[in-house]
Amino acid sequence: MTIIANQGSHLVPMERLLGIILSLLLVFACSSLSANQQDWELVSDRNDIQVYMKHRDESRLKTFRGVTRFTLKDEYALAALLNDYPSYPKWLHFVDSAEEFDRRGPLDRSLRFTTQLPWPLADREAVLQALVKQTMTADEQSVMIDLVNRPDALPPNNDYIRFPEMTGKLGFRRLGNDQVEMTYELILDPGGYIPAWIANILLRDAPYFTLERLRRMISKPEYQNHYYDYLDLHGPGRPQAAASLGDSQNHQNVTK
């Protein structure tokens, strides 16, 4: 006995109806995947640094990602640089100060950043929790710092407009032969009044200049030959007897 469904004045076999539904679902899924893959738009490609955008120009929420590849023989140099808060204005674009105001352990910290924007724009501040995820498996070897917005962790400061929304990440994955791919991503609402076109120009520059300066900073002598026992990385400062942290580690924050 064939089960049928009534479609207006026509009778459609249930098997055919199910086939139509499954086909529509498959088309929708493929369309969604294609849209997601096309969300990132390349807006700048210079000095081996690619900057991508993922938002409408008029949107309050701005999303930018910078990616670069380079040689990094001492991976602990990145941790050493991130430990050096006074150095942040030298490489983190628009940041003019960075401080740690709370710590739940050596791998979980709360940070405050202030930014100095060109006149007549008001200066901003960000209050963030910095967490790190370290993955060391056969398929992936990476360290990624996640920045989570915590705007209520400190009292308001009348000298700054606090970012109402902000998340980000900074880290690298190994490519082999001491090559790494470094990523810096920002998703934020700048708060207050900033014309959309100005915000787009300013924020588009942030990933580029941050990565360009970071590449130079981590090669400086003061950041070489360090070792942090909470990170399973490569570097000449790592003792030969240092134990591995395991095949896969999830930590919070790459500074100590």
Segments from the language model and where they lie:
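Compositionally biased non-globular segments, especially hydrophobic aliphatic-rich helices
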Residues: 5-8, 26, 32
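Bacterial N-terminal signal peptides that target proteins for export
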Residues: 5-21
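Eukaryotic helix-grip
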Residues: 33-256
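Hydrophobic alpha-helical elements and their junctions with loops/disorder across both membrane
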Residues: 9-12, 30, 214
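Bacterial N-terminal signal peptides
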Residues: 19-29
